[in-house]
């Protein structure tokens, strides 16, 4: 076991054997380190050692799998270094490359390659690119619908199309089929699940609603909602009885409570008919008038609460009891044939799609898991019990343990696969259900929760639950803040899990105390922006809450701008300081250098719930303020003017009779006409399409315009001809060259980004043609499909994430990462519940919930199953949003800052402080589940803290919060900001800048406030070490090695003389073959790619050369220059044998090494701490456990009288060795130059 100090819980997770283990690892708990240590422990167990290829290690991304393999390799290398004579450890390192450390998709693909013959699959099958799969699905849908329309009996299908197809065509029904197909794929037996969907709507004559299995859940929902109404009435009654309260209201409120209370008795046996009669019979009396001295505030609050209760009760009636039970029953019966036909249509699509893929030798990502299940399930399997096949039993015997990372994100299909390849007690599952945020990918956190509850029972023998609650990431201030919030809001009912002692974080991070350094300690900052002056009217309907309007989009834009400006100012104050205190506000801990350093832009990250449509606003505002910012924006690509213009050009090459694209191209720099020219062209032919007008105008007497059009039409005809002959990628590159558009956009503002966007289009076209689809028309159709579905390619990257910039990313992208300073913005933005408005809802357990549509009257209303499913989806979505918030807050290492905007702070405060004085830690479940945004959780929780007194004061509430909550050790700093103040401040800055520019332009004097001297000081500043500025700050090893060589010769008393011999010009040489440098590069490429699993022979080298030519890694003339005997000679040598036997070999390994400037440039005077970055690439580095063997390849010819290779390359090799020792921390025990021309081994 490693020397690392493990906690007792970590040690248990590492060492516990012979049982299924579920490790609930909280954020920052070091789960990956524990997982790696467990694997090493299994391999090195002195009693029952396991080979690394006897482990199945499943991760959820390729990057995670690669990191896991690397970390296991490092741990094995370290173990081998401590025990260099262990043949077993050396063998484990050798086997590591073939070990099953993989994503589940890759595991399934490997199984398909081995057992394809069981599936009627072409052995040469390939996995379809998502683009190809999407296009194929569209083709299949069109063919399927065409078949359905041509069938004799289409009555049910026609009704299905009319009901759910959309207003103009059947596109919405096609989308519904695709959605249902994808959704069913998360079920282990999708066809059986689809077939069962209509069962909920089979209601025989004589049966009632009470005979339906789902009616009890509907009643439960109604009872809960009625309890919420009762709670509001009780709050109003309590206010009425307070001193100064509206006492006359008490009698009416008591009557209300007496009338409503019987409906909350959870009478499950009560018939729907009885429930209908009871609820619709409720009447509301008028409140008695209040006389005398009454507190108006208490009176208004009591009135508002009762009005809210009445509204909620009326909503219950309108939602569930708008029709007689007999009417509802008949409507449900009418849905059965529609649901059955929809399921049948989806199954037909599935089968036809499968046939098309098999015909093309394709599988898609959805197939991988289901094909794998087919292999692993016994052929006589039934749905009630998943029995393993012979292949599954064989795999069970092969794998000593199955280890699963991120288990909280598993789905039912994946769980079934893992169960089938596992023994009874050899599963190790690690994850954190509080971080399960992939519901949109159909992840099922309930699988984790059910195991957690089962294994937590000590009497259970199926497995053991171990909790890792120590957080080694965040400062105590962050840990306390997270615990304070989630103790109150994450309940079993609202968040699907109780945030108790088992789940809360315990601080384990060690941030050294620094008395002379200001660190990032201090309260969590919360900025609340009041949008009241935006003058946007509040919309109170449910539909307005769940559906964005244009007004809300404008509101979001204003909120984003305001938040960005506020954040920008806070960042500038952090990094640059303020007028009162210049310089960075605090220092952050840097693990790499082991000390505190000033906070910089790269330490800061801004998290948004989603970056789509929002990150660009933040980017624009922050960059305007001078804050360097980076965001990997997933949208905006198709809106980029250069992409739009070029797609228009491709469209008219495909079909020039498209008016809008044609006009766009003519107006663009590709042709360069003015708007007036376009008007003149249209006047030449007022009828017909614009292309005809262009042709007529080209032949008319229009001067330069006619000349330009003639040239363009000639080019267009040539391009259309090339489009029929050339590949799509070649056509696009030809257009870039011939139009000069690629170079043109490079000269525009943001030219680098624009050119990158055009390159993405070229590469996307290349990827498209690698599929089974071809042609410009299909490519354009695919692009339009992407646009219509709201998908995007994402703007190309033109800036590295590692630069000193503030990064903006989505919360989902941040998962698994950590940041010194974290802003979580957009906390007032509404949760996206738009999916709840669809005509058809689907749920994995409850089935389908359709809208009932009467085609004759076009009247529609939600069916009871839809209402149930809607409620369940909303509940699950709210729980997921709570987990998303948990992920966001736990990314912070040292400083956490929360920012949100609200429409009306006064109204929001009234809502937030409703339960401030409730006893106990948790807030009411009804209030938590009714949240519309993250602030609806954060602010009610903070209002109960002693730092939340401002929230309580502004809400005008009295009393003391629950003492245990109020005295919590977390610390909060609340800052209130009006939107108008942020806008005014920004406007003032603009006006000041504009006024200053006007005065400068008019050469008028202005008050400098000491600025002139400061400007003069900055402009006259000179670098103190002018000599250093004449030398490069970055150099390659080959550039500086001569300086070390010369120094070494001087120390040895050797002087070299190398006469300069000018080579003949290339055109005078008889042999125009490769230069020595080019031949050397070719040898390096071969040595980089040659397999090391066996001794290469001449035939093997020839095969490798052909493969490298096919992959365009090597040119044919380079391959011709390679002598296979030189390659085989290397591996036959003693050095080559050491390479083949080594457990780990790195080839073409790049490095960067910072050296003192005086060490590189000895002629310079003392340069203080000036450094030079030296970069190089090591040809071959062999890890032999106790040290490295460093090999440098040379293809130089050695002639008599020349310096020996030792003299020529000593400096270079010594630099390489120094870099290895400094960076990897292990000595280089042997330094070798291998000369390929004569097979000589030269030791340095």
Swiss-Prot record:
Domain of life of the organism encoding this protein: Bacteria
EC number annotated for this UniProt entry: 3.1.-.-, 5.6.2.4
Domain UvrD-like helicase C-terminal: 515-816
Region of interest (Disordered), residue spans: 538-559
Enzymatic reactions: Couples ATP hydrolysis with the unwinding of duplex DNA by translocating in the 3'-5' direction; ATP + H2O = ADP + phosphate + H(+)
Record's keyword terms, sorted: ATP-binding, DNA damage, DNA repair, DNA-binding, Exonuclease, Helicase, Hydrolase, Isomerase, Nuclease, Nucleotide-binding
Listed InterPro entries: AddA, DNA_helicase_UvrD-like_C, DNA_helicase_UvrD/REP, P-loop_NTPase, PDDEXK-like_dom_sf, PDDEXK_AddAB-type, Restrct_endonuc-II-like, UvrD-like_ATP-bd
Pfam families in alphabetical order: PDDEXK_1 (PF12705), UvrD-helicase (PF00580), UvrD_C (PF13361)
Cofactor(s) recorded in Swiss-Prot or TrEMBL: Mg(2+)
GO cellular component, one term: DNA helicase complex
Residue ranges of domain UvrD-like helicase ATP-binding in the record: 4-475
Residues at which ATP binds: 25-32
UniProt-listed NCBIfam families: addA_Gpos
Function in brief: The heterodimer acts as both an ATP-dependent DNA helicase and an ATP-dependent, dual-direction single-stranded exonuclease. Recognizes the chi site generating a DNA molecule suitable for the initiation of homologous recombination. The AddA nuclease domain is required for chi fragment generation; this subunit has the helicase and 3' -> 5' nuclease activities.
Subunit structure, interactors included: Heterodimer of AddA and AddB/RexB.
Similarity comment text for this entry: Belongs to the helicase family. AddA subfamily.
Name of the protein in its database record: ATP-dependent helicase/nuclease subunit A
Lineage of the species this protein comes from: Bacteria, Bacillati, Bacillota, Clostridia, Eubacteriales
């Amino acid at each position: 076991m490693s020397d690392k100090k493990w906690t007792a819980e970590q040690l248990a997770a590492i060492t516990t054997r012979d049982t299924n283990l579920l490790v609930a690892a909280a954020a920052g708990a070091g789960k990956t380190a524990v997982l790696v240590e467990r694997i090493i422990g299994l391999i090195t167990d002195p009693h029952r050692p396991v080979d690394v290829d006897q482990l199945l290690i499943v991760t959820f991304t390729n990057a995670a799998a690669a990191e896991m393999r690397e970390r296991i390799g490092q741990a094995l290398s370290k173990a081998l270094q401590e025990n260099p004579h262990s043949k077993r450890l050396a063998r484990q390192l050798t086997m590591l490359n073939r070990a099953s450390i993989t994503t589940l998709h890759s595991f399934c693909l490997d199984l398909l390659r081995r057992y394809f013959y069981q599936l009627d699959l072409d052995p040469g099958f390939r996995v379809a690119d998502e683009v190809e799969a999407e296009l194929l699905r569209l083709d299949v849908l069109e063919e399927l619908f065409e078949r359905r329309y041509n069938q004799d009996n289409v009555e049910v299908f026609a009704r299905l199309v009319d009901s759910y197809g959309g207003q103009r065509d059947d596109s919405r029904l096609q989308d519904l089929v695709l959605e249902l197909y994808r959704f069913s794929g998360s079920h282990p037996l999708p066809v059986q699940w689809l077939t069962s969907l209509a069962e909920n709507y089979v209601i025989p004559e004589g049966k009632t609603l009470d005979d339906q299995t789902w009616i009890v859940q509907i009643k439960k929902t109604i009872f809960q909602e009625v309890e919420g109404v009762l709670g509001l009435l009780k709050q109003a009654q309590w206010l009425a009885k307070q001193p100064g309260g509206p006492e006359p209201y008490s009698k009416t409120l008591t009557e209300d409570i007496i009338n409503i209370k019987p409906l909350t008795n959870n009478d499950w046996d009560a018939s729907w008919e009885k429930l209908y009669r009871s609820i619709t019979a409720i009447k509301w009396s008028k409140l008695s008038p209040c006389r005398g001295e009454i507190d108006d505030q208490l009176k208004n609050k009591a009135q508002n609460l009762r009005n809210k209760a009445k509204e909620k009760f009326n909503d219950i009636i309108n939602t569930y009891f708008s029709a007689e039970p007999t009417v509802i029953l008949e409507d449900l019966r009418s849905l059965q044939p529609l649901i059955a036909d929809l399921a049948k249509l989806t199954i037909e699509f599935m089968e036809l799609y499968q046939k098309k893929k098999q015909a093309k030798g394709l599988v898609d990502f959805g197939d991988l898991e289901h094909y794998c299940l087919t292999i692993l399930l016994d052929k006589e399997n039934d749905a009630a019990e998943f029995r393993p096949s012979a292949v599954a039993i064989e795999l069970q015997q092969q794998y000593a343990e199955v280890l699963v990372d991120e288990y909280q994100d598993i789905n039912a299909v994946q769980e079934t696969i893992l169960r089938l390849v596992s023994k009874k007690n050899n599963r190790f599952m690690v994850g954190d259900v509080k971080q399960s945020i992939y519901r949109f990918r159909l992840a099922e956190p309930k699988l984790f929760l059910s195991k957690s509850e089962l294994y937590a029972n000590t009497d259970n023998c199926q497995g053991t639950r171990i909790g890792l609650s120590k957080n080694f990431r965040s400062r105590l201030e962050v840990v306390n803040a997270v615990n304070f919030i989630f103790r109150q809001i994450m309940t079993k009912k609202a968040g699907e899990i109780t945030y108790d002692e088992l789940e809360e974080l315990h601080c384990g991070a060690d941030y050294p105390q620094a008395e002379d350094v200001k660190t990032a300690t201090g309260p969590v900052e919360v900025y609340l922006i009041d949008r009241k002056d935006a003058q946007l009217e509040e919309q109170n309907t449910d539909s307005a809450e769940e559906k964005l309007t244009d007004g809300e989009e404008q509101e979001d834009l204003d909120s984003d701008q305001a938040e960005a400006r506020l954040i920008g100012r806070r960042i500038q104050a952090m990094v640059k300081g303020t007028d009162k205190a210049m310089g960075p506000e605090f220092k952050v801990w840097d693990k790499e250098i082991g000390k505190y350093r000033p906070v910089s832009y790269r330490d800061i990250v801004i998290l948004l719930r989603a970056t789509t449509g929002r990150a660009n606003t933040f980017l624009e505002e922050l960059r305007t303020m001078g804050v360097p910012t980076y965001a990997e924006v997933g949208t905006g690509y198709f809106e980029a003017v250069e992409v739009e213009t070029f797609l228009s050009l491709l469209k008219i090459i495909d079909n020039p009779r498209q008016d809008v694209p044609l006009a766009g191209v003519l107006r663009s720099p590709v042709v360069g006409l003015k708007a007036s020219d376009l008007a003149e062209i249209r006047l030449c032919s007022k009828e017909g399409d614009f292309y005809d007008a262009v042709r007529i105008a080209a032949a008319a007497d229009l001067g330069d315009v006619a000349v330009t059009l003639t040239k363009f039409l000639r080019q267009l005809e040539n391009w259309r001809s090339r489009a029929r002959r050339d590949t799509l990628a070649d056509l696009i590159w030809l257009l870039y060259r011939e139009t000069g558009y690629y170079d043109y956009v490079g000269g525009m503002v943001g030219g680098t980004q624009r050119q990158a966007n055009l390159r993405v289009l070229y590469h996307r076209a290349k990827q498209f043609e690698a599929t089974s689809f071809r042609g410009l028309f299909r490519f354009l159709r695919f692009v339009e499909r992407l646009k219509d579905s709201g998908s995007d390619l994402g703007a190309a990257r033109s800036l590295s994430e590692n630069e000193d910039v503030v990064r903006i990313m989505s919360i989902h992208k941040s998962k698994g990462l950590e940041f010194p300073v974290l802003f979580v913005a957009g906390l007032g933005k509404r949760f996206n519940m738009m999916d709840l408005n669809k005509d058809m809802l689907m749920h994995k357990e409850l089935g389908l919930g359709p809208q009932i549509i009467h085609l004759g009257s076009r009247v529609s209303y939600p069916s009871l199953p839809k209402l149930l499913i809607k409620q369940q989806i909303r509940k699950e979505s709210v729980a997921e949003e709570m987990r998303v918030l948990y992920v966001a807050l736990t990314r912070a290492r040292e400083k956490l800052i929360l920012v949100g905007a609200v429409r009306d702070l006064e109204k929001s405060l009234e809502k937030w402080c409703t339960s401030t004085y409730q006893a106990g830690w948790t807030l009411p479940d009804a209030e938590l589940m009714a949240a519309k945004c993250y602030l609806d959780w954060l602010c009610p929780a903070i209002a109960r803290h002693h730092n939340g007194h401002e929230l309580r004061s502004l809400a005008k509430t009295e009393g003391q919060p629950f003492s245990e909550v109020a005295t919590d050790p977390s610390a909060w700093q609340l800052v209130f900001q009006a939107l108008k103040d942020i806008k005014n401040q920004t406007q003032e800055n603009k006006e000041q800048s504009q006024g200053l520019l006007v005065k400068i332009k008019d050469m008028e004097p202005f008050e400098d406030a000491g600025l002139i001297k400061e400007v003069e000081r900055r402009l006259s500043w000179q670098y103190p070490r002018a000599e250093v500025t004449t030398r490069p700050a970055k150099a390659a090893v080959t550039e500086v090695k001569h300086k070390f060589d010369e120094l070494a010769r001087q120390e040895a008393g050797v002087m070299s003389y190398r006469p300069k011999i000018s080579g003949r010009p290339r055109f005078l040489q008889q042999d125009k073959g490769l230069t020595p440098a080019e031949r050397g590069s070719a040898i390096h490429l071969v040595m980089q790619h040659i397999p090391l699993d066996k001794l290469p022979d001449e035939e093997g080298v020839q095969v490798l050369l052909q493969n490298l030519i096919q992959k365009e890694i090597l040119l044919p003339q380079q391959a011709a220059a390679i002598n296979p005997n030189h390659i085989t000679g290397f591996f036959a040598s003693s050095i080559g044998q050491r390479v083949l036997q080594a457990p780990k070999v790195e080839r073409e390994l790049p490095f960067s090494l910072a050296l003192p400037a005086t060490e590189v440039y000895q002629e310079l005077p003392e340069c203080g701490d000036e450094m030079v970055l030296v970069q190089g690439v090591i040809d071959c580095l062999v890890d032999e456990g106790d040290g490295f063997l460093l090999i440098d390849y040379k293809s130089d010819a050695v002639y008599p009288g020349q310096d020996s290779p030792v003299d020529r390359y000593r400096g270079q090799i010594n630099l390489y060795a120094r870099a290895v020792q400094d960076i990897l921390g292990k000595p280089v025990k042997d330094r070798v130059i291998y000369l390929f021309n004569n097979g000589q081994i030269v030791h340095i």
